Amino acid sequence: MNGLIPTQNNDALAGVRNLFRHLMDAHVVEALYVPLETENSVITPALVTDPVYLERANPFAPAMPINGARAVAEITGKHAPAQIGVVLRSCELRALMDLIKLQQSSLEQLVLIGVDCPGTYEWAEYNRLQRDGGLSLDDYLAAGSRGENLASPALRVACQMCNQPVPEPADIRLHIFGADLSQGIPITVEDGIASILELEPVEVSGADGRQAVVDRVIAQRDQVRQREFAAMRQRLDAKDGFAEIFSTCIRCHNCKTACPICYCKTCLFCTASFDHEPEHYITTARRKGAMRMLSDTLLFHLTRLNHMSLSCVSCGMCTTACPAEIPVGMVFSVIGADVQAAFEYRPGRDLSEPLPLVTFQADEWEEVGEKRK
């Protein structure tokens, strides 16, 4: 059902906070996972059970501390302990879908609330804009509704080239693209939830222009995506390109921690398997003439690529987390896109679509061997 959240004095944030309170008051959800804004304007994800805290909810803030799929997987496990609503961006929803396929989360007792995403800033830039008074949420939403500046260099690179900015699938979708937010916030609500909330269908003025704005945003970002991919492929194709890109890796494993798909409770690279004896280093250095330090960094990233590339949603959180400013996310996005194309798979597209590596088709990959008669 299509509806409209009324706004107070053109305040979209107040309108969406009222919706969240309504969801809790009507017992559609018992708890809500949503970004909260502290008194110092810091955005932090939180699981809210007391509606009082929803006065701080800000799902529109252009900041992304974590990919929320990680938190949702922790909150729900295989069986959510309560009816929980989760407010997520598109890349977070898509990551969650693949985590569900990997049996790390469940849709049981989960209400998915998706928000159109005009893009987010790196933390340092977001904090600077907040501190200097250069970030107006109203202006940000207005630009998003018109589809303007959504490939701006000020945004995170992952957002500049994101060509899937609309949250799907979701039980409730909050529309920004193409919306006249002075009228209210257009929403799409699953019929059962709409009935509980006693919402009435509303014909939204200008709704026909939404798809045009979405198409324009995707076209802008596809241009950035093609340019960035071409530059990264050139670096990867160069002699020792992969090793050169990761040459400054300090083996902190931040990228692993930030990745929503990297879910192993005990990572091989955090075990004693890679705690080498001192003799190992001198022996290896003598054999090769020189040994890269810290050791095993390339093996770490190659292993993650092998595990993650099919489900990489290009959220870019690994790049954000890297203290050495290595473009980890760009490497994974480029290689992930090639792997996903080879298997005709797109992460998060369809929950019923199985992960390629857990399926078998007798007639696939015939080019790597002779077809049996």
Give the role of each language-model region.
Residues A14-L19, T44-A46, A207-V213, P260, ...:
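Short charge-dense sequence patches
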Residues M1-F242:
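Iron-sulfur-associated redox domains of electron-transfer enzymes in respiratory
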Residues R221-S247, C264-K373:
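Ferredoxin-type iron-sulfur electron-transfer modules in oxidoreductases and energy-metabolism complexes
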Residues R89-R94, A154-P167, S247-L268, S309-E325:
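Local cysteine-cluster metal-coordination motifs and their immediate loop/turn environment
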Residues R17-N18, A243, H253, N306:
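Residue-level marker for well-ordered alpha-helical positions
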